[in-house]
Amino acid sequence: MPKVALYNQNGQTVGEIELNDAVFGIEPNKHVLFEAVIMQRASMRQGTHKTKNRAEVSGGGRKPWRQKGTGRARQGSIRAPQWRGGGTVFGPVPRSYSYKLPKKVRRLAIKSALSSKVLENDIVVLDQLSLEAPKTKEMVKILNNLSVDRKALIVTDELNENVYLSARNIPGVKVVAANGINVLDVLNHDKLVITKAAVEKVEEVLA
């Protein structure tokens, strides 16, 4: 089982924590990570694209000229696709791009993402994370104490409002609860800062 240092908010080592091998110690599956990221990004698409077809554009109800005798090509409507201002053929329509991978694959993906952070030594485990009041300066100080100077994902056991409000104005820092942890967030941030209670909660669900 991988062991990592346990820190307090002042950046001091206060012990060690043993992480569950089944969650934080597996060989990361790159293909599953890829599939999970594609799924998440697809779900983020708005899908509100739309063009009008020949039935929806304005006008074109009358035949522009008679069928025969003019010497010109036959036409049925000035809103046919070949006309300027005509309707689009097989154009985009509003749709949802979201889909779901099997539950086992999704779980393997999040375990692979967490294990990759342990392998790269990009995980910081805190004994606890609490603030008396929302204060961005205090959160910056805590991150500096932990030598976290890059994009960081902070994971708490439950969404702490003071922690959330203190971190939301710091560029590159995001706060999520343990039950909201996902592959895209873990991979998109350089450092994973997670509380001991959140580790236990994640292991309880994924182990």
Curated annotation (Swiss-Prot):
GO terms for biological process: translation. Residues 44-78 are annotated as: Disordered. One of its GO terms (cellular component) is ribosome. InterPro entries: Ribosomal_uL4, Ribosomal_uL4-like, Ribosomal_uL4_dom_sf. GO terms for molecular function: rRNA binding; structural constituent of ribosome. Pfam families: Ribosomal_L4. Keywords: Ribonucleoprotein, Ribosomal protein, RNA-binding, rRNA-binding. It comes from the Bacteria. Disulfide bonds: none annotated. The keyword Membrane does not apply. The keyword Secreted does not apply. Belongs to the universal ribosomal protein uL4 family. HAMAP family: Ribosomal_uL4_B. Part of the 50S ribosomal subunit. NCBIfam families: rplD_bact (TIGR03953). One of the primary rRNA binding proteins, this protein initially binds near the 5'-end of the 23S rRNA. It is important during the early stages of 50S assembly. It makes multiple contacts with different domains of the 23S rRNA in the assembled 50S subunit and ribosome. This is Large ribosomal subunit protein uL4. It comes from Geobacillus kaustophilus (strain HTA426). The gene is rplD.
